[in-house]
UniProtKB/Swiss-Prot annotation:
This protein's record includes keyword Electron transport: no
GO molecular function: 2-dehydropantoate 2-reductase activity; NADP binding
Entry's localization field: Cytoplasm
Name used for this protein in its record: 2-dehydropantoate 2-reductase
Binding site for NADP(+): 7-12, 74, 99, 123, 261
Binding-site residues, substrate: 179, 183, 187, 197, 246-249
The gene coding this protein: apbA
CC per GO annotation: cytoplasm
UniProt lineage: Archaea, Methanobacteriati, Methanobacteriota, Thermococci, Thermococcales
Taxonomic source organism: Pyrococcus abyssi (strain GE5 / Orsay)
Enzyme Commission (EC) number: 1.1.1.169
Amino acid sequence: MKIYILGAGAIGSLFGGLLANAGEDVLLIGRDPHVSAINEKGLKIVGIKDLNVKVEATTRVPEEKPDLIVLATKSYSTIEALKSARHIVKGSWVLSIQNGIGNEDKIIEFGGKAIGGITTNGAMVEAPGVIKWTGKGVTIIGLYPQGKEKFIEKVADVFNSADIETHVSENIISWIWAKAIVNSAINPIGTLLEVKNKVIRENDFLLSMAMEVVKEGCRVALQNGIEFDVPPMDLFFQTLEQTRENYNSMLQDIWRGKKTEVDYINGKIVEYAKAVNLEAPMNLLLWGLIKGKEALEGKK
């Protein structure tokens, strides 16, 4: 399968590297110095697996369309990425494996055929051309917002053959919301206190607060017509257990002096609450506190 990874950061490079290693025709689209390092020495994957993969990388979007575009940018870069790839997005299958709510809607606005996706795999860029696979997780994909499609079954088969455990859902929008709700509770609390995820699980005050954030997100989702395949509270406890030793991605962004994705997680939950005349005070508070922390960190 001819696959372009649009946004060759940590997760994008991990998926692209594993797919290329399995013999798929992969092109990583990203930024220097990461792209240059991959073209010079190959893509090195360390951690869960140790691989050195020969894979093509570029900073420019090609003219030719692939079979599948995997969108793996940060959510705040979605529009910029889709604009740069407008000529290949239109009429093409585009799979989002991003955090947050609303990325798939943007794909549709640009004329793409949207496949929703979530992944619990963990990865980080250790150095240009080097990706650390920090946690082996599960990927769930499906026709957005709901439904069946034979091509998506084929994508899942390709991913599974590349050691990316993948399942297909006919209700992918519910998984996107469920993951966003879990992230809305764990990420801001872990970021504000600068602690590993296990601290939230082990501290009664933090755990009860995080659980209230999950409940609030569920109320907003249900009022917006989302029907969950799996209760987000179950996913919340499962995530805390599986990522006990992790510093969450929002905190890692803050430490690197980068913008976080809070606007597309807590911010979106607040936005959807307003749309159905609900209030989401805990999400509103966490959203504001993270935006404040972003601004303060930026001034250091």
